[in-house]
């Protein structure tokens, strides 16, 4: 099944790869490396495994970066389009303002020209009035006609000025209305853009939370698989150790039986006397009568104490591994993905990836092998000498219970 998953993950293209595919590839490589270690040993692959882990971590980061959702891309494109429209409208407003400024400048120039003409006409009128007051002579018909002509000219100029001013005023009002409409459109677009930006931020936050939850679940899965593999390896190693001890016990029992069946030399007179006394006191039909010498009984007790010591050391090793498993199971709780995303994402802290946890069984195998070598080298005679009396019974009972559980 795992080989099929590896083949399916490797058959996919680079754009279709997901984080789960990367973890499937890592699990399959871990199994292959485990097989190679079982055949050749872990020393040959001690330098290769960290490099494989680093390559798989880089592949995981690249796949997680490339697997962005299409909704965020669409929102990004929409936001870029709105920004372009806003820039175009701002440029149009600038052009419109420049045109209005030009119109105002033209109007001001024309108004100044007209004011200059009015001032000139007023001065001419004053001069004429002064001339009339100085002369104090009755006006002739020619003077009256000239005065009427001048007034009509002034009226025509004033009328033209008024028409021009009214026309420019109407144009300015129309431009002001257009400006207000454009400003309303710009405000509406800004509100829409802010709303879209908020929606985009919410979507990004949700996507990041979902990605963080998915990564945490994948890491939990990888941790459980690695823990299961290590437990299986430990159980298999303990079974092998127990089977080896059982075989050793059988061999020792066989050797004891062979020693018991060997012929004994001629006894001394004192021994014959003791044997006669024992035979006289012991019933030959009793099934529980003594059949071994004192030295043989001492040898059996010495072997029993050695086996008790080995079983006790194995029991301590099992308790140590169980405590390690309980510490791994009762590890620190996972942090909230939303709180971790709110913190600084560019911090220097990098959590241990699932691939490193998956390949952590290599280091555990080394520690187990070193511990076994230490147990095999340690002398047993010192531990056996201190076990006497009631402690021997307690240790034998605990060792038997441990063997039954295994």
UniProtKB/Swiss-Prot annotation:
Residues 340-351 have a biased composition (Polar residues). GO terms for cellular component: centrosome; ciliary basal body; cilium; cytoplasm; cytosol; membrane. It comes from the Eukaryota. It is found in: Cytoplasm, Cytosol; Cytoplasm, Cytoskeleton, Microtubule organizing center, Centrosome; Cell projection, Cilium. Gene3D superfamilies: 1.20.58.1770, 6.10.230.10. Residues 5-99 form the RH1 domain. Residues 234-272, 323-351 are annotated as: Disordered. This is RILP-like protein 1. Belongs to the RILPL family. GO terms for molecular function: dynein light intermediate chain binding; protein dimerization activity; small GTPase binding. Pfam families: RH1, RILP. GO terms for biological process: cilium assembly; epithelial cell morphogenesis; nitric oxide mediated signal transduction; protein transport from ciliary membrane to plasma membrane. InterPro entries: DZIP_RILPL, RH1, RH2, RILP_dimer. Residues 105-319 form a coiled coil. It comes from Danio rerio. Plays a role in the regulation of cell shape and polarity. Plays a role in cellular protein transport, including protein transport away from primary cilia. Neuroprotective protein. PANTHER family: RILP-LIKE PROTEIN 1, ZINC FINGER PROTEIN DZIP1.
């Amino acid at each position: 099944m795992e080989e099929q998953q590896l083949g399916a993950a490797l058959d996919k293209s680079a754009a279709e790869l997901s984080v789960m595919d990367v973890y499937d590839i890592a699990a399959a490589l871990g199994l292959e490396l485990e097989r190679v270690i079982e055949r050749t040993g872990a020393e040959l692959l001690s330098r290769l495994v960290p490099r494989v882990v680093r390559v798989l971590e880089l592949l995981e980061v690249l796949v997680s970066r490339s697997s962005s959702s299409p909704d965020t891309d669409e929102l990004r494109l929409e936001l870029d389009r709105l920004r372009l429209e806003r820039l175009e409208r701002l440029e149009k407003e600038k052009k419109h303002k420049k045109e209005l400024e030009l119109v105002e400048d033209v109007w001001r120039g024309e108004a100044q020209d007209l004011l200059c003409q009015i001032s000139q006409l007023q001065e001419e009128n004053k001069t004429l009035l002064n001339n009339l007051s100085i002369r104090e002579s009755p006006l002739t018909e020619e003077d009256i006609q000239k005065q009427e002509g001048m007034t009509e000219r002034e009226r025509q100029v004033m009328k033209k000025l008024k028409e021009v001013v009214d026309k420019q005023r109407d144009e300015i009002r129309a431009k002001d209305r257009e400006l207000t409409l454009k400003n309303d459109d710009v405000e509406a677009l800004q509100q829409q853009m802010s709303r879209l930006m908020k929606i985009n931020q919410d979507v990004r936050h949700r996507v990041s939370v979902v990605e963080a939850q998915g990564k945490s679940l994948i890491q939990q899965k990888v941790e459980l698989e690695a823990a299961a593999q290590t437990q299986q390896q430990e159980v298999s190693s303990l079974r092998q150790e127990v089977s080896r001890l059982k075989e050793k016990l059988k061999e020792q029992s066989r050797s004891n039986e062979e020693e018991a069946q060997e012929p004994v030399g001629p006894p001394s007179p004192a021994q014959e006397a003791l044997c006669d006394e024992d035979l006289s006191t012991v019933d030959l039909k009793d099934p529980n009568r003594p059949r071994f010498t004192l030295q043989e009984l001492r040898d059996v007790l010495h072997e029993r104490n050695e086996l008790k010591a080995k079983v006790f050391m194995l029991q301590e090793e099992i308790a140590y591994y169980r405590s390690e498993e309980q510490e791994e199971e009762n590890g620190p709780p996972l942090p909230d993905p939303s709180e971790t995303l709110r913190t600084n994402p560019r911090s220097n802290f990098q959590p241990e990836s699932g691939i490193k946890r998956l390949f952590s069984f290599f280091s555990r195998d080394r520690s187990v092998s070193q511990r076994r070598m230490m147990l095999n080298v340690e002398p047993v005679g010192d531990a056996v000498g201190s076990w006497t009396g009631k402690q021997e019974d307690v240790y034998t009972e605990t060792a038997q219970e441990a063997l039954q559980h295994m």
